[in-house]
């Protein structure tokens, strides 16, 4: 009876087993018909196990066995371009992959001495983020907002922008509709993103247990690349549904409910996951894979709010764990400003150190100007008599807002972003009528792409700013408009 147990009770994706005296926390348990489970809690008289397959085939009184193995998932380069479930099994109809390397889903995060400061930028291709809320490799940046405000779109655009940048991307779908997942897969295929992307899918039709382990599976796969000295990006879409799945399992196990019926350790649920994302130094990578090179794992957790309430339990928890947040505003989204980023409430705590110097220099005032514009705009609704200075501020603020707007999946490279920031600083910007700003931007960006400017100069070239200023002056004087 030490390595053998009998099913006593079956709940929804959770079973209570008598026996299994030698079972360890996190151990894989084998049931009949090759059904697998993970030890979730150890009690004096019984063991609770979460089932990873179809639990409907289990019956009371059935036997189960210890495997003396911690639950592991396959890792490796062979997974790139594939769609897998939370157990590491392929879901696409492509040929079966042979992987010899496995890794446990639960791991301890790198220690203080294993880490390095965030000092390299991770470009999203989104103008407002790369200029005002910069993200560095190894950072954890929360994306928070109500449903249908473009949270997933920001992450997909970021994945699209990593093309030819030698960054592996992992997209973890937690509790989403299958139709939404298919839509995301089709977008990634359209932009050839599956060449460097792995999709870990646990949809709404999967059990709470599978949704619960999905982000840990994704994190383990990402850590494989980080520990090889590579840069990796992981998107958790979304951790609200992950917390719901954990709450469901905990309530089935009759654990005492706390605030909003979540169990007491829901903070640790997300902190142990997100702490695994970090920039590690070359000595840590050398210990893992004999490569003297630093690696990084950048995380984009997504949290869905209700009516813009960021003070509820899960949002406040994840805000306190992460290194900053991008707040998406429903009102901005409905007024046609997309991406609907609220610059006043969004912040990047460590990304500033990783930002290119030229962008840091040019974007310093823009954030303040936009925040002041939003305040003045609200104030101007109550006052008809405005002085000329306030009117000018409102006009410039509106023009900057238009310049920061972006079409879905239309990513901007670093040179295009610098050009936009230089246009804002240029005297000619004040002369452009509001209704011509978008037209002017499209024309000058198309011109920059046409002459293939990014192939002509390096980002760290001292003359870059002068070259782009000359290009703007040439563009204006030659009336290419």
From Swiss-Prot:
It catalyses: ATP + H2O + 4 H(+)(in) = ADP + phosphate + 5 H(+)(out). Produces ATP from ADP in the presence of a proton gradient across the membrane. The alpha chain is a regulatory subunit. This is ATP synthase subunit alpha. The record marks 346 as: Required for activity. It is found in: Cell membrane. One of its GO terms (cellular component) is plasma membrane. F-type ATPases have 2 components, CF(1) - the catalytic core - and CF(0) - the membrane proton channel. CF(1) has five subunits: alpha(3), beta(3), gamma(1), delta(1), epsilon(1). CF(0) has three main subunits: a(1), b(2) and c(9-12). The alpha and beta chains form an alternating ring which encloses part of the gamma chain. CF(1) is attached to CF(0) by a central stalk formed by the gamma and epsilon chains, while a peripheral stalk is formed by the delta and b chains. Keywords: ATP synthesis, ATP-binding, Cell membrane, CF(1), Hydrogen ion transport, Ion transport, Membrane, Nucleotide-binding, Translocase, Transport. CDD domains: ATP-synt_F1_alpha_C, F1-ATPase_alpha_CD. Its EC number is 7.1.2.2. ATP binds at residues 145-152. Belongs to the ATPase alpha/beta chains family. It is an enzyme of class 7 (translocase). One of its GO terms (molecular function) is proton-transporting ATP synthase activity, rotational mechanism. HAMAP family: ATP_synth_alpha_bact. It is a peripheral membrane protein. The keyword Repressor does not apply. InterPro entries: ATP_synth_asu-like_sf (IPR023366), ATP_synth_asu_C (IPR000793), ATP_synth_asu_C_sf (IPR038376), ATP_synth_F1_a_nt-bd_dom (IPR033732), ATP_synth_F1_asu (IPR005294), ATPase_a/bsu_AS (IPR020003), ATPase_F1/V1/A1_a/bsu_N_sf (IPR036121), ATPase_F1/V1/A1_a/bsu_nucl-bd (IPR000194).
